[in-house]
Curated annotation (Swiss-Prot):
Family of the protein in this entry: Belongs to the amino acid/polyamine transporter 2 family. SdaC/TdcC subfamily.
GO CC terms of this entry: plasma membrane
Mode of membrane association: Multi-pass membrane protein
Name of the encoding gene: tdcC
SS bond partners: none
KW Transmembrane helix (keyword) present: yes
Protein name, as recorded: Threonine/serine transporter TdcC
Amino acid sequence: MSSTDSVVAGQAKVTTWRKTDTRWVLGLFGTAIGAGVLFFPISAGIGGLLPIIFMLILAFPIAFFCHRALARLCLSGRSISDNITDTVDQHFGHVGGVVITFLYFFAICPLLWIYGVTITNTFIAFWQHQLLLPAINRGVVALAILLVMAFFIYFGKDLMVKVMGYLVFPFITCLVLISLSLIPYWTGDIFTSFDMHSLSLFGSHGILVTVWLGIAIMVFSFNFSPIVSSFVVSKREEYEADFGREYTEQKCAKIISRASVLMVVVVMFFAFSCLFTLSPQDMAQAKQQNIPILSYLANHFSSLGSGKSTYATVLEYGASIIALVAIFKSFFGHYLGTLEGLNGLIIKFGYHGEKSQAPMKKLNMISMVIIMGSTWVIAYINPNILDLIGAMGAPIIAALLCLLPMYAVWRVPALAKYKGKASNYFVTIIGLLTILNIVYQLM
């Protein structure tokens, strides 16, 4: 075969979409679709029709450009097996590695606290509204739930990993089915309450502030950054030796693009379906009650009384159960990340980074007590979940997902070719706006 024929054959092979690419599209999509999605309709719908339309326009650019920027940073590592920690160590030295370890821990730990509050509130709402049982002490409920989860995590972690993996796509399927099932209950309230004369761009309830606060929830909900490093390593091992790094970067971008489209379609359809069923006032009430949208929907159908259909009854109980399973799935996944981050900090400072010297069984137990204890305190205090996401969860995610890659583009020679791209300014602005949520929450 001539060299020309080899090139043509190689190009044909390059353009082929592989099964592994499809698996990663679904893997990235599945990582993002979790309990965080259950709060997005509340934040998006609380301002009415116009803000959620703006969020619809921003959804894909936020999901795609931010994750592509992080993937490019991961791709800049010298070896195809370098993960994000290795890559940051190469570019910024040991101090940079320590900073990333801190950011990684503090990006995930607040999310665990959020899910601790959420699962407590969801269980209490199910207990009182669906089971119609008398109120129980919040501290006891939170402690009991956390002890049960700690038991399963400590004694059956491997089994739980498998179970949670199997639950990802059934949860997504349920989310789509609920979105479709709500169609018969769509009302025109969102349109009848829409008044152009009462709209304002500025002010605490203006469109710009609502969209700004919504961006933080979007960064939180449309987030598959925890798996991007593993994804890039996998694609580099699969493609880079045969086709080069530039092609691998293009393939990663295409996979991220398709995952982002899938994610935006599912989440935004779910958000619009909830908004057409409820009203902005309902969304405000859901925020005040500090419960996810599925729990509020369950309570909404419960309030229909004896006149409700069997269909509505199924939705009522199904929504609550799906919410509990989704939150437990997200809690478990973020617990493992928090445990890894806390162990990493203890090993880095207590054992000078020598993992072989650390008694891992004892360390896991100490970390579990610290993590579960702090989660119980936060769950008992019951801070507003959307405010907690805006003040802690989303800003730290934005620092890792948006600002770190943009800083690397400015400073690292291997990423200099991406300087001056319009998408860089967009990603930087999204990161800064998300972090500025902290200032708004303190005002």
